[in-house]
UniProtKB/Swiss-Prot annotation:
It comes from Homo sapiens (Human). GO terms for biological process: digestion; proteolysis. It is found in: Secreted. It is an enzyme of class 3 (hydrolase). Residues 1-15 form the signal peptide. Belongs to the peptidase A1 family. This is Pepsin A-3. It comes from the Eukaryota. Shows particularly broad specificity; although bonds involving phenylalanine and leucine are preferred, many others are also cleaved to some extent.
Amino acid sequence: MKWLLLLGLVALSECIMYKVPLIRKKSLRRTLSERGLLKDFLKKHNLNPARKYFPQWKAPTLVDEQPLENYLDMEYFGTIGIGTPAQDFTVVFDTGSSNLWVPSVYCSSLACTNHNRFNPEDSSTYQSTSETVSITYGTGSMTGILGYDTVQVGGISDTNQIFGLSETEPGSFLYYAPFDGILGLAYPSISSSGATPVFDNIWNQGLVSQDLFSVYLSADDQSGSVVIFGGIDSSYYTGSLNWVPVTVEGYWQITVDSITMNGEAIACAEGCQAIVDTGTSLLTGPTSPIANIQSDIGASENSDGDMVVSCSAISSLPDIVFTINGVQYPVPPSAYILQSEGSCISGFQGMNLPTESGELWILGDVFIRQYFTVFDRANNQVGLAPVA
């Protein structure tokens, strides 16, 4: 009987998981559009999402070119606490980057004044460093310092976590951003200044029982989405998880066999590489095949630069199917056409990301909303299953 009780306790300990609820909010793009500021923003800022994946390093100032404009369309955000007592911040949980950044009281830029700012003097556990970091984007740089403190995330106390405290943030557009900072969940190999990512620090301290985390993004307008640290909750998906090997341990990069529509290959006919990225809202790929897809679904560019589709056409459009590791993952038109306040916008975006293995695709939130996703660091693989 004692052995049965012990085994039960062990099984229970292995099932412990920490959930961080995500709230879906109005994107920065939508806010700027409603305020009549989007056109001016697009003129001033040359949007190039590719810079997120291929940063330009400039030693010794440790410059990392990761433009925050990449988060223009983000809608899912969670709350973390930093310091003792905890100071709360709304962040993007981003599997396409590896650093944790929040504004600080040392920042007097307009964008910082409208967001939560970390005050080291209010935390009894903060440790300063002499390191500085700069993130280049748009027409200037977000400069900051690095420090260590306790990060509260989903009930986990992540002690001695290195993070960035911004000192300057250029451009007024971030004033309207629905988030304070970024929490990166990619591999440590792409971390700026060699900073240990949050999940790595959590695992290294033995705070979770499994070296993995999982993501469920709800199509609901506000609630239901979640990041799960250290576990998998089968109530969020149907069927079984299909596992896909990570091909490059930097981003969560995998191989896509093909992309088809009506049974015909429309892209990636001989296979291609893709990054599964919660920090990118759309499905992005090389400009040429994306242009063909836009044409196939009847999308045309409007004055704001969005690719719009007739809302009445959605019901007649076909699924676009991503075949990954031999398994088909259909994305229906109700998912790849984004509907908002009477307008319908294509969820595809052209972006050239050349690598030694060919052009990269990005499977962003449009895809992840359809498929519960497990990011398994222990086995360097991604698990996918249809959402429940």
